[in-house]
Amino acid sequence: MGIAVNWKIKRFEELSITELYEILRVRAEVFVVEQTCVYQDLDEKDKNAYHLFCEDNGNVTAYLRILDKGVSYPEISIGRVLTSQSGRRKGLGREMMNRAIEFVLENLKEKKIRISGQLYLKDFYESLGFETVSEVYLEDEIPHVEMLCGGCKHEI
C-alpha cells in the first residue's frame, strides 16, 4: 500500500502542538539518532520560517523549513531537509523540494534560494537548479557545500 500524502505549509505560529511535536521528533530521529549529529536543533530560526511537511496518518514523513531572508543568509534559504525512514525511496524529497521552490517563487516572489546541503546530495540539488558556490566545509562533522539557485527548476 502506498503512502497517504498530505502536504502542509505553515508558519511557526500556525503549527499545532501535535504538528510541532512530530516535526521535532522526526528531526531528532533523522539528524541526531541516524546521523549521530549532536547539535542544538532548537535554534530560534523556526520562529522565522515556513514549515513544509508531509504527513501520513499523523506521522511526519518529509520535512523542511523555509527561512526568511536575513535569518541565515541574505537570501531566503531552505534547511533541515529530511525524509523519515518510512518516507524514503518514494520521491517525497524531490516533490517536497519542488513544492518549496514553487512556494518561494510564486508566493514569496523571491528568485534566489540558498541552501547548505550535505555533500552527498549535491547532484540531487543540482538537478533542481542549484549551483555550488562554496568549497566543501564541515558542519557538525558532516561535509557540506553552500548552493544557490537563481532560476530553480521545479515540477509538481
Per-segment meaning from a language model:
Residues R114, E126, E131-E146:
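Conserved catalytic-core motifs of GNAT/GCN5-like acyltransferases
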Residues L42-K47, G70, L138-E139:
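A short beta-turn/loop motif at secondary-structure boundaries
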Residues K69-I78, R88, N107-K111, E141-P143:
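A conserved beta-turn-beta hairpin within the catalytic core of GNAT-like acetyltransferases
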